[in-house]
């Protein structure tokens, strides 16, 4: 059985040390491919000659956790099919340019047991631009369901901080409802942005991970939620995007219809959940905008 020792990894429940800056280069093609990969149709994000062409705010989400110094003897990694996105938080401080270089630094902030034989690991990341300005703040929560097989992690005591929190939606009809169809090649396109986990394309890997068929990337679901909210509440104006947080409650599959139910929660803030049929797939979620 694999063993986690987060008490040693995170003494006194303090965050771990920041890793070295990781230099990341990207270009216009990467920006366009990401937008198409999360199903965006608005030309301001998918056509480079559009007068308002810009980076969709959640573009850097895949950099979450990059370079975090994690002692694998204390917090062992899981193979792709057993390591899935559980929660994500992204805050836009300054828009990214449509191409160039940024630096990402990350650190481990928490590791806690999650059910029988599983671990929930959280990292914090900051993205800075060529001027040294902070552009993006992120927290990445991953659900490690084993190191060699499903549920093979020994019971352990959690340590560190957690951004995970329960957020209940109101018991009334939503103020806004919007939806999107997940096309049958959506995962094939999204993976070209750099997430090559076989869980999302290989039926055998999906079965190893406990699913009957490949599932949509959690970060693709995340992107769909963000683009639906920006369209419904901000007229697709990326400058109005502030922050978004989600928990992935259940997997989304190709050809599913993703429905967002949105409730106002004060000026510039909404609570939301996403469902496929009667199944809630995104919960404990909010979006803030100006």
Positions of PLM-derived features:
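Hydrophobic, proline/glycine-rich low-complexity stretches
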Residues: 1-103
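A contiguous, surface-exposed recognition patch within enzymatic or periplasmic domains that forms
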Residues: 2-48, 158-221, 228-231
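HotDog/MaoC-like acyl-thioester-processing domains
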Residues: 2-13, 86-177, 252-255, 259-290
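Solvent-exposed, flexible loop/coil residues
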Residues: 14, 28, 49, 63-65, ...
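Hydrophobic residues on conserved beta-strands that form the core of alpha/beta folds
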Residues: 34, 137, 241-243
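Residue-level recognition of well-ordered secondary-structure positions
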Residues: 35, 39, 59-60, 107, ...
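A generic structural micro-feature
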Residues: 82, 117-119, 238
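Catalytic-pocket segment enriched in acidic/His residues
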Residues: 204-269, 274-280, 290
């Amino acid at each position: 059985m694999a063993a986690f020792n987060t008490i040693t990894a995170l003494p006194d429940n303090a965050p771990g040390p920041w890793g070295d800056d990781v230099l990341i280069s990207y270009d216009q093609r990467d920006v366009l491919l990401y937008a198409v990969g999360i199903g965006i149709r608005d030309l301001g994000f998918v056509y480079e000659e559009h007068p308002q062409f810009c980076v969709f705010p959640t573009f850097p989400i895949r950099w979450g956790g990059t370079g975090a110094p994690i002692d694998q003897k204390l917090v062992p990694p899981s193979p792709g099919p057993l390591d899935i996105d559980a929660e994500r938080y992204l805050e836009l401080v300054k828009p990214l340019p449509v191409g160039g270089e940024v630096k990402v630094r990350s650190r481990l902030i928490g590791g806690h047991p999650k059910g029988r034989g599983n671990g929930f690991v959280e990292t914090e990341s900051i993205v800075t631009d060529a001027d040294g300005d902070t552009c993006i703040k992120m927290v990445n929560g991953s659900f490690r369901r084993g190191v060699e097989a499903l549920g093979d992690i020994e019971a352990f005591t959690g340590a560190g901080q957690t951004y995970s929190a329960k957020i209940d939606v109101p018991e009334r009809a939503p103020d806004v409802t919007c939806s999107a169809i997940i096309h049958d090649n959506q995962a094939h396109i999204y993976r070209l942005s750099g997430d090559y986990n076989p869980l999302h394309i290989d039926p055998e890997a999906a079965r190893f991970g406990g699913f009957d068929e490949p599932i949509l990337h959690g970060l693709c679901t995340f992107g769909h939620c963000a683009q639906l909210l920006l369209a419904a509440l901000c007229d697709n104006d990326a400058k109005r995007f502030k922050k978004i947080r989600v928990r992935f409650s259940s997997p989304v599959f190709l050809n599913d219809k993703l429905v967002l139910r949105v409730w106002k929660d004060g000026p510039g803030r909404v609570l939301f959940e996403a469902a496929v049929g009667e199944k809630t797939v995104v919960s404990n979620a909010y979006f803030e905008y100006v």
